[in-house]
Amino acid sequence: MEEFQVYLELNRSRRHDFLYPLLFREYIYALAHDHGLNKSMIFLENQGYGNKFSSLIVKRLIIRMDQQNHLIISANDSNQNSFFGHNNNLYSQMISSGFAVIVEIPFSLRLVSYSQGEEVAKSHNLQSIHSIFPFLEDKFSHLNYVLDVLIPHPIHLEILVQALRYWVKDASSLHLLRFSLYEYCNLKSFITPKKSISILNTRLFFFLYNSHAREYESIFLFLRNQSSHLRSTSSGVFLERIYFYGKIEYLVEVFYNDFQNNLGLFKDPFIHFIRYQGKTILASKDTPLLMNKWKYYFVDLWQYYFYMWSQSGRVRINQLSKYSLDFLGYLSSVRLNPSVVRSQMLENSFIIDNAMKKLDTRIPIISLIGSLSKAKFCNTLGHPISKPTWADSSDSDIIDRFVRICRNLSHYHSGSSKKKSLYRIKYILRFSCVKTLARKHKSTVRAFLKRLGSEFLEEFFTETEDEHVFSLIFPRVFFTSRKLYRGRIWYLDIICINALVNHE
């Protein structure tokens, strides 16, 4: 770790020129190994990589790379000219994990120098997934339409390599990355949403994908900013559109590669852009015709600049008042909240009907039950079933597992507008736990509950520490029996999507 810190203190002008030699350092692979262990602890999963890692294998890998005279081997001749011998998969996993650590160094250096600035405020809470929903509550109620964009996957590996050329200036590292991708990955099925990648390191894969997505985001954000700062132009050229829009103020010409279009971008301070997983949301107060303009701009940008085949069907225009957006485990929509105000003036009284827009966040109960069914907690109809694979554990371990899953889901879906769906999920997990314990003790559910009583499962509905704080602040909105808070709560400590929520 000390050598890694020493490298970070190198001269800024030469930092990016020394990435490739780090592949011959053992501590790089130790860092990658430690990161894999930390990730497995966070997700409570055994990745199996720790059993294969050893310093002896790392030394053998470094010796093989040091003795190799050339790295450029044709992808078609990869079987005849094997670079690592019979341990191709293991060595390629180690190289990709080490490269994932190395390629992030320029970004880490930039982050360190950025955080040392005096004007930078601490924003650790913005790392939470829930931090986006208060923003949506403030902004989406004033918007009309949303573009639901499915980001296309690159059809060629070279696109991913080219996306890094602007950030990583080390040609040797880029050649090694290109060689690894062509040598060990199938070009036709490398990036598919339903196909797991066993050879390429997951950390490296997400880094490449985010770098690729950032390329088109930077172009889009540039156009978005220019649309609000360009000088006013004469509306005489757009006489045929005055009837529909009134005076049009802004026009920008974009020239990128062979893609040349005149895009009439109109000043719109109410446009918001969000990217999550493999999707993008573009919400605006524009008219449907303007949203169509953005739709076909995305398609043309992907096809002519990024050479990715995309269809207009991947970009859908929806009205927020009539459409529920499947977003980070919530179904979000804008609904009208009616209210009646009675006004008394002397002897006359007036009743005023008022309707305000409000962001409604609900739990996608059907998809969540599908995730529970896939995990063998219930059937496809939502009826609880036993978990036979856990029946060999102790009673306390079984109860602890179910309670932990239940509380994690409650913690993640605490921002739901309607708690009824959340209670149903708790019911499924509660009785799945009972059936698992009854199966272990070879008894029926009724006999098991009669013998031990139902009080031992009250942990599923007991008040958590956070809910206790809210009960002290808002005592009137809590139930006297169960003390469950009905309002929406957004937590600032959620850094990843729950595995059951991310059913895709």
From Swiss-Prot:
GO terms for biological process: mRNA processing; RNA splicing; tRNA processing. It comes from the Eukaryota. It is found in: Plastid, Chloroplast. Coiled coil: none annotated. GO terms for molecular function: RNA binding. Keywords: Chloroplast, mRNA processing, Plastid, RNA-binding, tRNA processing. InterPro entries: Domain_X, Maturase_MatK, Maturase_MatK_N. GO terms for cellular component: chloroplast. PANTHER family: MATURASE K. Usually encoded in the trnK tRNA gene intron. Probably assists in splicing its own and other chloroplast group II introns. Belongs to the intron maturase 2 family. MatK subfamily. This is Maturase K. It comes from Bombax buonopozense (Red-flowered silk cotton tree). The gene is matK.
